[in-house]
Structure formats: structure tokens, C-alpha cells
Design a protein with these regions (language model features):
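Compositionally biased, intrinsically disordered linkers/stalks adjacent to structured regions
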Residues: 146-171
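Sec-dependent bacterial lipoprotein signal peptides
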Residues: 1-19
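Surface-exposed short loop/turn segments
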Residues: 23, 64-68, 74-75, 80-124, ...
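Conserved acidic
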Residues: 45, 49, 103, 145, ...
Length: 171
């Protein structure tokens, strides 16, 4: 019976050894956990894409939970961004059925983003490039399909921005 207890304890110890470096708390200091995200400037040809990306960045911060959304006067971190370009490319076409021909298109956007420490006024990340990608199907009314896909594109960019905010090296 003592051998079973010993083996059980040894098994638990071995399994928990892999978790020794895991932390339940964030590396972001408590006084740096407020964020403000103004509307991103949109230099692309896709209408309202700057608004969509900024809104999705806010949602991603809320979903992740480390940062609290704040006003510009009370925030510790401000995320400023510019949607600099978008592109649309055909990926795949199927000509087997001419009555219901569908085309897959890849929608890509590039954002330039800066992270500003509002307490010190220091730019922590200066003009980092983020590329978001998504795909959609369709032949007719590509502009509407592109606009509809912009939410998924914004999710991709937002996830990258929030990941970087969580991994900032704070002084």
C-alpha cells in the first residue's frame, strides 16, 4: 500500500513539474492596465475600416480581460493606428458549373500602430506594421462582400495588437 502512495505522489510531482513556470497573473503592472483606443485613421479605399478595426481592438481588450477601457485623460496606454492599405486578390476559381460559379478572394489590410505610455508620454512601440487577412467567396457585388468581411479582417489585426500589448516590456 505504501508503494501505491509513493507512486501516486511521484506521478503528481512529475505532472506538476511542467507547470512550474506557469503564472496565473499578467506581466502588465497594475498601474498600466487601462487603455484608450481612438478611431484608427483610414487611408485605405474601404469605407469605415478604421472604425471597424478600432472597435474590434476595444472588443479584444475587453474579451482578454487584463486591460480596462478608459478615457484619454485617465488611461495608461493609448493605441493609435492607421489603416494604410488594403488589397483584394482572387485565390481560386471553379469553372465546373457556369450557373453557380464562385470565386474565393483574399482580403488583406495593413495597419501601422503605435503604443503610447500616457503616464510618461513615451512611445513604447512606434509604427509597428500589422497585416490582417481573411477570405470570402463571391462574384457579385464584391464591394459589399468585402465590407462584410472587414469584421473578420479586423479581428485578425486586433488579436495581434492585443497580444503585443500584453507582451510589452514595461519599465
Amino acid at each position: 500500500m505504501n508503494v501505491l502512495k509513493y507512486l501516486f505522489a511521484l506521478t503528481i510531482l512529475g505532472l506538476s513539474a511542467g507547470c512550474a513556470s506557469y503564472k496565473w497573473t499578467s506581466d502588465v503592472p497594475e498601474d498600466k492596465r487601462t487603455v484608450f483606443v481612438p478611431v484608427f485613421r483610414n487611408d485605405s479605399e474601404v469605407t469605415e475600416l478604421g472604425n471597424v478595426v478600432a472597435r474590434q481592438v476595444l472588443r479584444e481588450f475587453q474579451r482578454e480581460g487584463t486591460f480596462k477601457i478608459s478615457t484619454p485623460e485617465n488611461c495608461a496606454l493609448e493605441i493609435q493606428g492607421i489603416i494604410s492599405s488594403t488589397s483584394l486578390a482572387r485565390v481560386n476559381s471553379s469553372n465546373r458549373d457556369y450557373t453557380n460559379r464562385r470565386r474565393e478572394r483574399r482580403f488583406t489590410a495593413e495597419a501601422t500602430v503605435s503604443f503610447i505610455d500616457k503616464k510618461s508620454g513615451k512611445v513604447i512601440v512606434n509604427n509597428r506594421k500589422y497585416v490582417g487577412r481573411t477570405t470570402f467567396y463571391g462574384d457579385k457585388d464584391v464591394l459589399t462582400l468585402q465590407r462584410n468581411a472587414s469584421g473578420r479582417l479586423a479581428e485578425d489585426i486586433a488579436a495581434q495588437i492585443v497580444d503585443d500589448a500584453l507582451n510589452l516590456k514595461w519599465e
